[in-house]
Amino acid sequence: MQSLNLPNAITLARIALVPVVVLTMLDARRGGSPALPAALVVVAALSDALAGYLARRTDEVTEFGRIVDPIADKALITGALTVLAVQNRVAVWVAVAIVGRELAVTALRSVAGRRGITVSVSRLGKNKTTLQVVAIVTLILAPDPYAWWVLILVYAALALTLVSGAEYFAGLRSRPGGEAGPPERSSSPGG
């Protein structure tokens, strides 16, 4: 299997989209439309699903894709949350907690990978990413980012983020014989 196939090209395009998302988010707070960065976040999320689907459907799941796809997810989430925190559209502590979890799981995967252990993506991890994207799009578009319904969504995303992070660490500690990961295993990108 070659590394630069269509699913991996889509993932690389998603990474290239991150600075565009950040710049359009910054512009939206200076009078630009928040619809554009919100739409770009949705496009990035849908491209993630498309890349994973194509990789599995065409049997083009590569080691490159397994490594780079979660990095693309984390770059998007981190970039968007950083801008939202700077713009005071989300509490800094919430952004730090979510980004901190993302970095911790990335570090866990890196250390485990060097030891020959695969940390697979769980269904909870995929759901976490989806809820994060919904929360980010809502924070971009909401006239009042501190409205009760927005806060419920943000705190739900935070809770799922922390629970899924704990699941990865617990899964690594409980797996004998070099296999690690959460209870539900998946070969698809994300997490």
Task: Place the predicted regions along the sequence by residue.
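Membrane-helix boundary/interface segments in integral membrane proteins
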Residues: 101-117
